[in-house]
A protein has these predicted regions:
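Conserved aromatic-histidine-acidic binding/catalytic patches
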Residues: 1-4, 43-47, 92-95, 115, ...
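Active-site neighborhood of HAD-like aspartate-dependent phosphohydrolases
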Residues: 1-30
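Short acidic alpha-helix initiation/capping motifs at coil-to-helix transition points
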Residues: 3-13, 48-58, 121-122
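Soluble or luminal CAZymes and related metallo-dependent hydrolases
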Residues: 4, 8, 51, 92-99, ...
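A metal-dependent, Asp-based hydrolase signature
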Residues: 22-84
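Substrate-recognition element of Asp-dependent hydrolases with the DxDx(T/V) motif
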Residues: 80-96, 100-132
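Asp-based, Mg2+/Mn2+-dependent phosphohydrolase catalytic module
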Residues: 101, 105, 119-122, 127-235
Length: 235
């Protein structure tokens, strides 16, 4: 993911510099601070703009470029859909996570709902591109988060709760499956459990293992989820 972020950041900052006829170094620095602020959720708790609206406003304010201008919007949309898909080189090396498809099948077989809660710091086109690289373009996700449908980034609990509201779910009904020891655990804790499929052993994880383990031992994962759910209700 880090390689993807660097490539995307470099390409977008270069495009902004060319469009605004500004130095690439200065534009890269300004865009970097915008993205840091976006991911750190540095704004008022009453600010209900989507991440995309926040990003567009800050780019115009700090870089002097109006991303909502139809021609400029079209240029970046073209990049996301027609250029970015061909950037998956040896450095990015994005591919399907072993066990991911089997895990999705296990969830489907259990009759459960499934959504993709990926960090919404990229526009929809970029998220869809990454899904294609991961062979998830046709996965039956009920909801996929991106800049345009979220008002906060992970791990802010607001991000998780606003998506659950869209789905009509309560936190105690949900199991997050993720591999990021920080971002995939809502902060502050809002009642959502996490099955952790990354490196390390986060103390808050309801279950830990690889994605392949998750698929193979899905019944054990479900059992751990319900045990924690009952314990929380009794506490």
């Amino acid at each position: 993911l880090n390689a993807f972020i660097l490539r995307y950041f470099k390409d977008v900052s270069s495009m902004l510099a060319d469009i605004g006829r500004r130095s690439r170094g200065g534009t890269m620095a300004r865009l970097g601070t915008i993205l840091v602020d976006l991911n750190a959720n540095r704004r008022s708790s009453t600010d209900n703009r989507t991440n995309l609206e926040f990003y567009q406003t800050e780019v115009e304010r700090r870089c002097g470029i109006c991303l909502s201008d139809p021609l400029i919007y079209e240029a970046f949309t073209y990049y996301d859909h027609e250029v970015l898909p061909y950037k998956n080189d040896d450095m990015i090396n994005a591919k399907a996570m072993p066990g991911a498809h089997a895990a999705l099948q296990a969830v489907q077989d259990a009759g459960l709902r499934c959504a993709l809660f990926t960090n919404p710091s990229f526009p929809q086109g970029a998220i869809e591109c990454r899904m294609g690289w991961g062979e998830l373009a046709d996965a039956p996700f009920e909801l996929v988060t991106h800049m345009g449908n979220a008002t906060r980034c992970k791990p802010d609990a607001t991000y998780y709760l606003e998506q659950l509201q869209v789905m009509g779910l309560e936190p105690h009904e949900v199991l997050m499956v993720g591999n990021d020891p920080k971002r995939d655990f809502p902060s502050p804790d809002c009642g959502i459990q996490t099955a952790y499929v990354g490196q390390g052993k986060p103390g808050r994880a309801t279950w830990r293992g690889t994605m392949e383990d998750f698929a193979r031992d899905f019944n054990a994962v479900a059992e751990a989820f319900y045990e924690h759910q009952i314990a929380d209700e009794l506490s």
